[in-house]
Design a protein with these regions (language model features):
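Bacterial Sec-dependent N-terminal signal peptides
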Residues: 2-5, 10-12, 18-48
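Short coil/turn motifs at beta-sheet boundaries
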Residues: 38, 57-59, 115
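Post-signal-peptide N-terminal segment of Sec-exported extracytoplasmic proteins
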Residues: 44-89, 119, 125-137
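Local beta-strand/beta-hairpin segments that build beta-sheet-rich folds
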Residues: 91-95
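Juxtamembrane/interface motifs at transmembrane-helix termini
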Residues: 96-97, 139
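Aromatic sugar-binding surface patches on proteins
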Residues: 99-107
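Surface-exposed, short loops/turns at beta-strand junctions within beta-sandwich domains
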Residues: 109-117
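Short beta-strand edge segments in extracellular beta-sheet folds
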Residues: 137-143
Length: 143
């Protein structure tokens, strides 16, 4: 009789332990329910004036057209444009940053110093996938 009671007690303790563990472990979860990052084509961009070119000296206006030629990311893009003297001084005289959902964006670079070669840098970043970035530059001179 004592042996039977010890056996039953052991079985009941085992079942209780198993139930507690199953409830505890099932609430641990398997990780985050965050969706995977969106699958997005690399940004492809053209500029006018073209990337990596040197424009002849001109009086202005100094316009820049940025065209997204790849599929537009679902949340759009951030376009950053800056212009500075091309003398190593890093003094920026024009800077803008805009968010866009359209493929074509026009900019007018202002504040260009006279008789100076300038460097325009353009950076386009996906607002959906911030690691998806395109960068380019061109040079122009004012008369």
């Amino acid at each position: 009789m004592i042996l039977k009671n010890n056996f039953m007690r052991t079985v009941l303790l085992f079942i209780g332990f198993a139930l507690i563990n199953s409830v505890t472990l099932s609430s641990c979860g398997g990780g985050s329910d965050d969706p995977p990052p969106p699958n997005e084509a690399n940004l492809a961009v053209t500029t006018d004036p073209a990337n990596e070119t040197v424009q002849p000296p001109a009086l202005g206006p100094y316009n820049l057209k940025v065209t997204i030629t790849s599929a537009m990311p679902p949340n759009g893009v951030k376009i950053e444009v800056s212009a500075k003297k091309d003398d190593g001084s890093n003094t920026v005289f024009f800077s803008t940053s805009v968010n866009r959902t359209t493929a074509v964006s026009d900019f007018s670079i202002t504040g260009t110093p006279a008789a100076t070669q300038c460097l325009v840098e353009t950076k386009v970043t996906s607002l959906t996938k911030p690691t998806n970035v395109w960068s380019g530059s061109y040079r122009y001179s004012s008369k």
